[in-house]
């Protein structure tokens, strides 16, 4: 048996998902899982160098691959539908390991980690990184090829939805409905942002010079008197969107 092989990691993970239901996402559970696979505790650093953190990372990577297999082909579907279906599948593969996932979340949020020399803030940081990584996996899986600033905003936005959806999922809520609502919010905001940008461009950027007429339209009312602050703000293109 090759200690750091994929097969060895998968065997230990399979055992661990059973033991952690009783012992939590803990070193004790990991040692038991390894022992059940015939591997001594002293060999664990060769398999999972950073212990429970590396095990968690391996778990999420495995679950990502399973969700992609469950999802199948997305050819011909809209981006919004690809994202929704990808999230449905990602949480669907967690159903059989819901208890283990709850143990892992408890591990991430355990305040004792911050006073532990071995752990410190790393579990909390990994919790955020995991959400970003899952979002990154989903975007790449549906063929996203963005390389500009959108690359990061897409993943940050989707990662936030994933982060919030985990709580709904663990409380046995309708996670698919939650996903739909959150994506709809994002879509509405993007439409609003696009309209705001176009309106600002039309009303401000299109004017190459600020002539007397332009100045009067913005700063003076119909009677030729200076606009009050309230009137001025209300007349700005951005605020017109709310009227």
Region locations from a protein language model:
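N-terminal intrinsically disordered/low-complexity leader segments
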Residues: 1-5, 216
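Hydrophobic alpha-helical connector segments
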Residues: 6, 70-107
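C-terminal ligand-sensing/allosteric alpha-helical core of TetR-family HTH transcriptional regulators
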Residues: 82-93, 100, 123, 130, ...
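Short, amphipathic alpha-helix enriched in basic
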Residues: 5-32, 36-42, 50-57, 61
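Amphipathic alpha-helical packing segments from all-alpha helical-bundle domains
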Residues: 115-144, 155-159
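Amphipathic alpha-helical segments used for helix-helix packing
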Residues: 95-121, 129
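C-terminal peripheral helix-coil segments that are non-catalytic and often amphipathic
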Residues: 172-243
């Amino acid at each position: 048996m090759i200690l750091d092989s994929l097969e060895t990691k998968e065997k230990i993970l399979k055992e661990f998902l059973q033991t952690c239901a009783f012992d939590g996402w803990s070193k004790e559970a990991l040692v038991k899982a390894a022992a059940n696979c015939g591997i001594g505790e002293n060999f664990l650093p060769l398999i999972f160098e950073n212990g429970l953190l590396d095990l968690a990372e391996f778990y999420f990577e495995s679950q990502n691959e399973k969700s992609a297999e469950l999802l199948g082909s997305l050819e011909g579907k809209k981006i919004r539908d690809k994202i929704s279906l990808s999230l449905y599948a990602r949480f669907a593969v967690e159903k059989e390991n819901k208890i283990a996932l709850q143990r892992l979340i408890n591990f991430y949020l355990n305040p004792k980690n911050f006073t532990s020399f071995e752990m410190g803030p790393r579990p909390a940081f990994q919790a955020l990184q995991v959400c970003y990584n899952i979002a990154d996996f989903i975007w790449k899986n549906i063929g996203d090829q963005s390389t500009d600033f959108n690359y990061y905003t897409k993943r940050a936005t989707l990662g936030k939805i994933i982060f919030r959806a985990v709580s709904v999922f663990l409380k046995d809520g309708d996670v698919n409905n939650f996903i739909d609502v959150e994506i709809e919010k994002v879509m509405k905001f993007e439409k609003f942002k696009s309209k705001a940008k176009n309106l600002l461009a039309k009303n401000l950027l299109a004017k190459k010079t600020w002539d007397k007429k332009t100045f009067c339209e913005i700063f003076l009312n119909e009677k030729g008197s200076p606009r009050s602050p309230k009137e001025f703000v209300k007349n700005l293109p951005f605020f017109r969107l709310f009227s």
